[in-house]
C-alpha cells in the first residue's frame, strides 16, 4: 500500500487544495464523511457534526479515502468546494457483479489477493456553504460510478434497501440557526440511483 498527497491551505481566496490522497466531510455527514464519529452520545450539544471540508490522508487505512484532486475557494461568507476521485477498490467480482466492497485492507490469503483492486470507483461532486456567526446553510452533491461493474448485495433482511447498480447520485441540504437560547440543526438527504436493478 502506498499513499501520497500535496495539501495547500489558506492562500488568499484558496481555502484548501488537495492533490493525491485526501479525506472530506460536509454537512452532517449523510452524503459524505470520512471523519470518525461516535454512533451515540448522551450530550445533545455533541450531536451536531462539524464540517471539516478537505483534509490530507496519512493513515494506513487502504479504503477510507479519495484519490484525485479537491479544492475549496472562499468568497466572503461563501465556500465553494469541488472534488474528483478515481481509484481501484477491492471486491469479489463474478461476471462484472460484486456483492460488497472488501474494506479490511488485509491480503494474507490467496482469496484476498484475488479480490485486490478488481473494480474501479469514480466519484465527483461539490459543496456550497454560506456561513454567518449564528447561521449557515450548505448544499452537497455527490455522484459515484463503478463503471462496467455492478453492485448486487446478497438478499438479506438487513440489506433490503442497500444500493444496487453501478451509478448513484446523492444530495443533501444542511442548516444551523442559533439564538441566545436555541440552536436548531437540520439535514435533508436525497438518493437517486440512476440505474438500479
Residue ranges and their predicted role:
Residues 2, 63-67, 120-124, 131, ...:
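Residues that define the transmembrane beta-barrel architecture of outer-membrane proteins
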Residues 2-52, 58-90:
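Outer membrane beta-barrel
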Residues 13-15, 76-80, 124, 133-137, ...:
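Outer-envelope beta-barrel architecture signal
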Residues 17-19, 80-82, 128, 137-141, ...:
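Membrane-embedded beta-strand positions of outer-membrane beta-barrel proteins
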Residues 30-36, 92-100, 149-157:
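Outer-membrane beta-barrel translocator domains and adjoining extracellular loop/strand segments
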Residues 54-57, 110-114, 157-161:
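Extracellular loop and loop/strand-boundary signature of outer-membrane beta-barrel proteins
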Residues 188-194:
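Conserved small/polar residues in nucleotide/adenosyl-binding loops
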Amino acid at each position: 500500500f502506498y499513499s501520497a498527497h500535496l495539501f495547500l491551505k489558506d492562500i488568499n481566496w484558496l481555502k484548501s487544495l488537495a492533490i493525491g490522497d485526501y479525506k472530506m466531510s460536509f454537512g452532517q455527514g449523510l452524503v459524505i464523511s470520512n471523519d470518525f464519529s461516535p454512533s451515540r452520545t448522551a450530550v445533545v450539544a455533541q450531536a451536531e457534526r462539524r464540517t471539516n471540508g478537505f483534509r490530507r490522508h496519512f493513515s494506513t487505512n487502504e479504503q477510507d479515502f479519495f484519490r484525485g484532486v479537491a479544492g475549496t475557494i472562499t468568497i466572503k461568507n461563501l465556500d465553494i468546494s469541488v472534488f474528483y476521485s478515481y481509484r481501484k477498490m477491492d471486491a469479489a467480482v463474478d461476471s462484472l457483479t460484486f456483492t460488497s466492497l472488501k474494506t479490511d485492507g488485509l491480503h494474507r490469503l490467496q482469496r484476498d489477493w484475488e479480490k485486490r483492486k478488481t473494480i474501479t470507483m469514480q466519484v465527483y461532486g461539490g459543496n456550497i456553504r454560506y456561513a454567518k456567526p449564528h447561521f449557515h446553510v450548505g448544499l452537497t452533491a455527490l455522484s459515484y460510478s463503478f463503471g462496467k461493474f455492478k453492485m448486487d448485495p446478497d438478499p438479506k433482511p438487513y440489506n433490503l434497501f442497500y444500493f444496487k447498480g453501478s451509478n448513484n447520485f446523492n444530495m443533501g441540504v444542511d442548516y444551523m440557526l442559533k439564538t441566545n437560547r436555541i440552536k436548531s440543526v437540520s439535514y435533508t438527504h436525497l438518493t437517486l440511483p440512476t440505474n438500479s436493478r
